[in-house]
Amino acid sequence: MTLIGIGNVLQKDDGLGVYAASYLNDNYTFSEKIEIINGGVEGIHLLNVLEESDHVVVLDCLQLDDTPASIYAIPAKEISGYGLNNGGAHEIGILQCMDMMELQGKEVPEAIVIGIVPAEVTFTFGLSDEIVDAFEGYISVVLQYLSKHGINHQKVANTTTLLELINRAKDPSGVMVS
């Protein structure tokens, strides 16, 4: 299984997926082999990751008409064609990559998007208060999904806080997911 955190930490709540992937990587060990990737805004560059995966969990914010901090777990097939992090003609989102795989006759991995409705997508670091308040619940939904698929987790002794991850993102030499 592969977890891919998607988003832009320079655009406040849009960075949620990257922060969530880093948080899971830093704070948990897992019973099965699981790859955690900071996908950032890579789009098309994640195509080879998708081709090598049989099960993908995409962590991202979802621009839906709902209350900020609402959490969704949606099979990628149900939102295929819409593309997450679609930044325009020059950028291809991860779901569009799956569409490309299907058009090329390649096997598309089982995929789910676990997303949260953003409160603020502006050019600044950090997360809005609404998303910070919902973050632990969001992580819990991700962990429940993993457990449901036979991947148990254990919290590590020396944990990294969300604030530490946000501060790490502000440091150009910082590494979000090692």
Task: Set out the residue ranges of the language-model regions.
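Predominant activation on well-ordered alpha-helical scaffold segments within soluble catalytic domains
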Residues: 18-22, 47, 95-98, 139, ...
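Conserved active-site and cofactor/substrate-binding residues in soluble primary-metabolism enzymes
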Residues: 15, 19, 41, 66, ...
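Nucleotide and nucleotide-moiety/phosphate-recognizing core
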Residues: 3-4, 9-78
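Phosphate/ribose-phosphate-bearing ligand recognition and processing surfaces
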Residues: 83-87, 94, 101-178
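Generic secondary-structure boundary/loop-capping signal
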Residues: 41, 68-71, 89, 118-120, ...
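Active-site-adjacent loop/tail segments of enzyme domains
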Residues: 71-95
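Residue-identity detector for threonine
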Residues: 2, 29, 67, 122-124, ...
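Residue-level recognition of the N-termini of beta-strands and the immediately preceding loop/turn
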Residues: 1, 34, 109-112
